[in-house]
Regions:
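ATP-dependent small-molecule kinase phosphotransfer cores
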Residues: 37-134, 210
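Walker A (P-loop) phosphate-binding loop of P-loop NTPases
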Residues: 22
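NTP-dependent small-molecule kinase module
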Residues: 2-7, 33, 150-220
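Pre-Walker A (Motif I) flank of P-loop NTPase domains
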Residues: 10-14
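Hydrophobic anchor at the beta1->P-loop junction of P-loop NTPases
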Residues: 17
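Conserved lysine of the Walker
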Residues: 25
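Hydrophobic positions on the alpha1 helix immediately C-terminal to the Walker A/P-loop
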Residues: 28
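A glycine- and Lys/Arg-enriched "phosphate-lid" helix/loop adjacent to the NTP-binding pocket
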Residues: 111-182
Length: 220
């Protein structure tokens, strides 16, 4: 991992965080951002869907339109891909090309897990769609913070923050979230070098330590 002074001529490192709802991604992203900042490592934090003006507008449509205005599954996967394409070309690739590290809250693995395994859409189609939307730009390392669907549901119920808008994906049935979790586990099984499973039931400091250990072992 290179400092700000060293990174001007080097490609940045791309790190993504994945996992079910309320797995602690936001906390771990913040801790990793602080870790990099303390070492003068230039880093940008972003999210999907979102990360750009257009991406944030698509996020509102895909996550918070409920009832009769909710998007159908086929439209949902295409909207996620549209947000990602804009994100990749306008933010992620330019940052990495400038030697800036990118930490992304969700990326293409979420589309495979949620829309592929969760919704039951064609996996090969999603793989092709992801490849097109990302322009082949994939994370150097992906951390999946793993929780059972039951643990995730309990955290959602007990969390302190209140959502101003209903999140229709978060509020989906337990059976859906069980399929999503299996999707993440299968992705990690197929790509063990890139995708690392970390138990999200551990203390946040322990999880952070494991993340740093994996970063230091994989990214030089």
């Amino acid at each position: 991992m290179k400092s700000k002074e060293q990174s001007s001529t080097a490609k940045g490192v791309f790190i993504s965080f994945e996992g079910p709802e309320c797995a602690g991604k936001t906390t771990q992203i913040r801790m990793l951002q602080e870790y990099f900042a303390q070492r003068n490592i230039n880093t940008v934090v972003t999210r999907e869907p979102g990360g750009t003006v257009i991406g944030e507008e698509l996020r509102m449509i895909v996550k918070h339109h409920v009832g009769e205005t909710a998007v159908v599954d086929e439209a949902e996967v295409l909207l996620f891909a549209a947000s990602r394409a804009q994100h990749v070309h306008k933010l992620i690739i330019p940052a990495l090309s400038s030697g800036i590290n990118v930490i992304c809250d969700r990326y293409s693995d979420s589309t495979m897990a949620y829309q592929g395994y969760g919704r039951g859409l064609d996996l090969s189609f999603i793989e092709t769609l992801n490849r097109f939307a990302t322009a082949g730009c994939m994370p150097d390392l992906t951390f999946v913070l793993d929780l059972t669907a039951e643990e995730s549901s309990e955290r959602i119920i007990n969390r302190e923050e209140t959502l101003f808008l209903e999140d229709r994906i978060e509020s989906a049935e337990l059976s859906f979230h069980k399929k999503v979790r299996q999707g993440f586990l299968e992705i990690a099984r197929c790509e063990p070098q890139r995708v690392k499973i970390i138990s999200a039931v551990q203390p946040k400091e322990v999880i952070h330590g494991q993340i740093i250990g994996l970063l230091e072992n994989v990214i030089k």
